[in-house]
Amino acid sequence: MPLGKLITFVLLVHVSHASASSLFEDNTVLEINLTGPISSLFDDVNSNKQLPFVLRTNDLEHTIKVRVRGKSRRRVCSFPPLRLNFAANDTVQSVFQDQNKLKLVTHCRDRGSVHASTLKEYAAYRIFNLVSDVSYRVRLLHITYTDTDGGLKEKEFDRYGFLIESASALAERVGGQAEHVTGVSLRSLDNQQAATVYIFQYLIGNTDWSLVTADDDDTCCHNGDLFDIGSVRYYVPYDFDLAGLVNAPYARPDPSLRISRVTQRLYRGYCISTDVLMDALSTIKARRVDILDVIRQLPGLSLKETVATIIYLEEFFVRADDENKIVKLFERRCL
């Protein structure tokens, strides 16, 4: 990011800091207990019904409303993502202060390596945080679920999950506003952010994104949000469960892309100047150690998964050692 923009962001973050919640300013694992009618909530995953739950953490108790969320994951997950709705007067002087509606990414399935996909998707968000300030922050949770209905195989069980910063909180933090439009002009995008997104998606092996509105979406863009900051728009990606880095058990590439596995990298960025691509590549390469440390520091990830994930990321960095070659690849493949 150019120095002028960096200084602007630092000032904006400083101004909004006083009203920000501590929830996303801490990277330690937050222990919570979520108690409620889980099996009733999952009776009809296509419903948006909200049910009362109790969330306990740090010796505090919050009465919240919970509903199922997500699109594709409702279809493939036995334990789909959730939305937690907090009462405004119930979060004062807690880690959830100033929070209202929060997205919770859950473990999805209990098969195989239960925690691996969740932890690696969390890592994808953290990696993007390292290369762009305009990104969704996340907080890792270790959750004890208690089903008061007793309709699940286990009444009480522990899983990892993570919370995602809301779009309104991100907008306030960076001094911008969320945009809900049906399309976006490439000329309206911040070039540095756009190039960083393109290369980041290639780094994590994610092809499940686009600057075009998807068939089942009302607004632009597929698996990304737009934010107006100053006179330009910033594309902020989310939903990385189909990325090669995560390699979720249910992940399959779009048949039109002509790749057989999600772990195969395919550049899906749009055409942009060589200088901007080089700058974005340098930004990502400069965080190589920090990026790999995100994986090394994941709690609950097996040694086998940790090594395999680091090797996957290192494959990118080895290719990126020849900057001219990889940028030429990007330019040949750009849309």
What does each of the following model-derived ranges do?
Residues 19-335:
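Phosphate/dinucleotide-binding and metal-coordinating scaffold of catalytic cores
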Residues 5-15:
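Sec-dependent N-terminal signal peptides
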Residues 1-2:
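N-terminal secretory signal peptides that target proteins for export/translocation
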